């Protein structure tokens, strides 16, 4: 089953949106297999955003993600990477549709509440970066047969 990585950024944690974000993914039928509240080290932030290292906004990304607690999560389900991106909305909240997390709660691109992996390969890399294998729990919800054929 496909997995994706999500992180509620410091602004989402401070605004008490963690429960609402989890609710949306559970309501969709996805399974939470990893969850932790953590302070992100500068090293982890630089690895996570490594593809942007040469861009002028890189220092601001690192500074922001390390400015407060983050809730890191791994979700599992059919097509979860693409579905999560739709639930999250466009990177710039001003371009996000109402009904998406960023469309409903975001105002500024630099404070866009949540990160979600953009591809299956990216999700695999990010999950390995943020979680040890023992931190991921395999389990079977009783409602699975009501969601998937």
UniProtKB/Swiss-Prot annotation:
Name of the coding gene: ndk
Its biological purpose: Major role in the synthesis of nucleoside triphosphates other than ATP. The ATP gamma phosphate is transferred to the NDP beta phosphate via a ping-pong mechanism, using a phosphorylated active-site intermediate.
Record PANTHER family: NUCLEOSIDE DIPHOSPHATE KINASE
Main location: cytoplasm
Active site: 115
GO MF annotation terms: ATP binding; metal ion binding; nucleoside diphosphate kinase activity
EC primary class: transferase
Family the UniProt entry places it in: Belongs to the NDK family.
Keywords: ATP-binding, Cytoplasm, Kinase, Magnesium, Metal-binding, Nucleotide metabolism, Nucleotide-binding, Phosphoprotein, Transferase
Designated name of the protein: Nucleoside diphosphate kinase
Coiled coil feature spans: none
EC number: 2.7.4.6
GO BP annotation list: CTP biosynthetic process; GTP biosynthetic process; UTP biosynthetic process
Keyword Zinc set for record: no
Cell compartments where the protein resides: Cytoplasm
Keyword S-adenosyl-L-methionine: no
InterPro entries, A to Z: NDK-like_dom, NDK-like_dom_sf, Nucleoside_diP_kinase, Nucleoside_diP_kinase_AS
Catalysed reactions, as listed in the record: a 2'-deoxyribonucleoside 5'-diphosphate + ATP = a 2'-deoxyribonucleoside 5'-triphosphate + ADP; a ribonucleoside 5'-diphosphate + ATP = a ribonucleoside 5'-triphosphate + ADP
Species of the source: Cyanothece sp. (strain PCC 7425 / ATCC 29141)
SUPFAM superfamilies linked to this entry: Nucleoside diphosphate kinase, NDK (SSF54919)
Xref: Gene3D superfamilies: Nucleoside diphosphate kinase-like domain
Entry cofactors: Mg(2+)
Binding site for ATP: 9, 57, 85, 91, 102, 112
Assembly and oligomerization: Homotetramer.
């Amino acid at each position: 089953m496909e997995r994706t990585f999500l992180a509620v950024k410091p602004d989402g944690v401070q605004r008490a949106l963690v429960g609402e974000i989890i609710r949306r993914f559970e309501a969709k039928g996805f399974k939470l297999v990893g969850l932790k509240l953590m302070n992100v080290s500068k090293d982890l932030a630089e690895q996570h955003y490594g593809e942007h290292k040469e861009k002028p906004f890189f220092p601001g990304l690192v500074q922001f993600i390390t400015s407060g607690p983050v809730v890191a999560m791994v979700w599992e389900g059919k097509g979860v990477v693409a579905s999560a991106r739709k639930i999250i909305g466009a990177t710039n909240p001003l371009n996000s549709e109402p009904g998406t997390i960023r469309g409903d709660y975001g105002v500024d691109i630099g404070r866009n509440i949540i990160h979600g992996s953009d591809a299956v390969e990216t999700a695999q890399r990010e999950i390995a970066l943020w979680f040890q294998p023992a931190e991921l729990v395999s389990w079977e919800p009783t409602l699975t047969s009501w969601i998937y054929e």
